[in-house]
Amino acid sequence: MHKIVFVTGNKGKFAEIRDILKTFGIEVIQEKNGYPELQEDELEPIAAHGAQYVANKLNMPVMVDDSGIFINALNGFPGPYSRFVEDKLGNLKVLKMMEGEEDRTAYFKTVIGYCEPGKEPLVFPGVVEGKIAYEERGTGGFGYDPIFEYQGLTFGELGDTEKNKVSHRRRAVDEFLEWFTSKA
C-alpha cells in the first residue's frame, strides 16, 4: 500500500482526501504542522511550494491542498485568501458583501500539490462552478459549503458522500490519481 502524507490542520479536508484515496489503496497520514505559505494571487505556486518544502523536511511523499472560492462579482475575491477571510469575516459577512449583486456566479478551486523528496513538485487543479446562495443552507461540510450552491443545493446540503463525488477537491484528486496510477 502506498503512503502519502497530507498536510492540513483541517479535519474536513483530511477526511475528504482520506476517504477518496483509500479506495485506491493509498494510505493517507495527516501532518498538522504546516509550512511557510507563500503570499501569491494564484493557488498553484502556493501548493507547489508547500508540497516540496514538507516532502524534503519529512523525507516522504507529500500532498498539500490549497483551495479558494472565487466570486465573480467581487473580482475573484477572496480567492487564495479564502481561509483568512473565512476566519476573519465568515460566511455571513461574505453574504452581506453580495447584497444587491445580480451576478452570483462563483467557483471553488483546489490545487493539489504533490512532491516526493528531492524532486520537483507537481500540481493538479480542480474546479467546480456554482453560485453564491442568498443565505446559509445546510449543516454539512465546512468553510464556505453552506453558501456555495451547486445544481440547486449548497455543498452544506449535499452531505459528504454526494459532495465528495463532485467537489473541486475531488476533481483535483482525480487529476492526481490519473497521473499517480499511470506511473505505478
UniProtKB/Swiss-Prot annotation:
HAMAP family: Non_canon_purine_NTPase
Protein's UniProt name: dITP/XTP pyrophosphatase
Short name of one Pfam family: Ham1p_like
Residues that hold Mg(2+) according to the record: 37, 66
EC number: 3.6.1.66
Top-level taxon in the UniProt lineage: Archaea
Keywords assigned: Hydrolase, Magnesium, Metal-binding, Nucleotide metabolism, Nucleotide-binding
GO molecular function: dITP diphosphatase activity; ITP diphosphatase activity; metal ion binding; nucleoside triphosphate diphosphatase activity; nucleotide binding; ribonucleoside triphosphate phosphatase activity; XTP diphosphatase activity
Alphabetical GO biological process terms: nucleoside triphosphate catabolic process; nucleotide metabolic process; purine nucleoside triphosphate catabolic process
Annotated active site: 66 (proton acceptor)
